Amino acid sequence: MKYVFPTSKVKRYRFPTHINDLVVDRADSQTSEVFIVVLGPGEAPPLHQHDDTEQVFYILAGAGTLSIGAKRKKYPVRPGDVVRIPPKTLHSIQCAGKKPLRYVAIDCFVAGRPAAEPTWDSHVKVLCAQQGWAYAQVVKRSK
């Protein structure tokens, strides 16, 4: 069992809208996964929700705007802020500055690891299919 996960050894996934550097794969955990999100100026993932996941973000660097709910209520975020996204909550976060927005994202699976997507790669394949993104172009294994 692993207890320490160096952030210098991550798997990089470059989506069309953002980067996820996987630190702890859900396959290596019972109820969570951890990644570092990097958004360039103006970048934001699509508004989305997770039915089985509560998310916690810790803002490391940059400035951003968190959008919550169908009405997209806006909240500014900056380094040191902690964000909590309950399950089934529409959300997105956009880089609002001239420098990248970086934050640690912790996914907490309230009912345990999702059986249909037991690894981060399996989740990425589903996400790519939903968004019309090419999985092979998203996956970048080196930082």
Language-model regions: role of each:
Residues 1-33, 46, 114, 118-143:
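A short, N-terminal "cap"/entry segment at the start of jelly-roll beta-barrel domains
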Residues 19, 43, 52-53, 71, ...:
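A generic "binding-loop/recognition-motif" signal
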Residues 28-31, 39-43, 63-65, 72, ...:
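Short, charged/polar surface micro-motifs in flexible loops or helix N-caps
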Residues 35-51:
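Conserved short histidine dyad/triad with adjacent acidic residue
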Residues 36, 49, 60, 68-70, ...:
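Residue-level recognition of conserved beta-strand positions in structured domain cores
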Residues 54-79, 89:
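A short beta-strand-loop-beta hairpin characteristic of the jelly-roll/cupin
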Residues 78-79, 87-114:
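Ligand-binding loop in jelly-roll beta-barrel domains
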